[in-house]
Amino acid sequence: MVFNNKEDLLQLYNAINHTDYQNPDDLEVNTLEDVLYLSMKNDVSFLVSGTMNLYEHQSTFNPNMPLRGVFYFSRLYEGYVADNNLMIYHEKRVRLPKPKYIVFYNGTKNQPDSMELKLSDCFENTDNEAPCLECTATMLNINYGHNQELMKHCRRLKEYSIFVQCVREYIQSEPSVEDALEKAIDTCINQDVLADFLKKHRAEVTNMILTTYDKDLYEKTLKEDAREEGRKEGMEYLNQLNKYLLKAKRYSDLERATEDIEYQKKLLKEFGIE
């Protein structure tokens, strides 16, 4: 929704591809609006410089995105062949735009700045023979603080990440989601963050978030994320402690620490692991 004009979309394309296209008319938006894709509200596909780009937004991590990409690209290429009167049953090879699939992720679970998701990872047969079909989705984390170089070159995307972070912070402090949204939108408008967009589409943005927001699921996800981070941090501390004990040849302490939690805490404090 935020990238609802060619100028913003071209800026995003330039930021991702390190290009400097200036004419928005060079970009041909061809998002499918067929009934089959009505649920894919956050997708946009467009052609520029011989590349067929598919951009999709996801608020949860989904390893099945490459499979979605296959379905989507097959329809896009089918439309491209028809629109350009390409003869696929002749001996002459047809020329097609190169596909590029980008997934913008801003879920609450911690993910790296960039990750490649491959269709082949879904296949049951994992022998060394290369599959005849592959689709790669590049997932970019657009949560606030991630992909800072990308954000530096695309103000719209940076402001969107700030807005989402602002909404999340107010949800934690305000008594209702409605109050949180009102404050987040007012704050961003006052700080010139997506101000033009939020002024024009305030009601739509509010309604969209209220429609998709599940308070219980959101809080459960935050708790699960915190527990997972705690487990990872705890394992790192224990691994560090074990290394120190092994290096010092304190084998009896190592054995005792695996059975006695209080003694384990004492050793962690002794080695300054906190």
Predicted ranges, named:
Residues 1-274:
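Elongated, amphipathic alpha-helical interaction scaffolds
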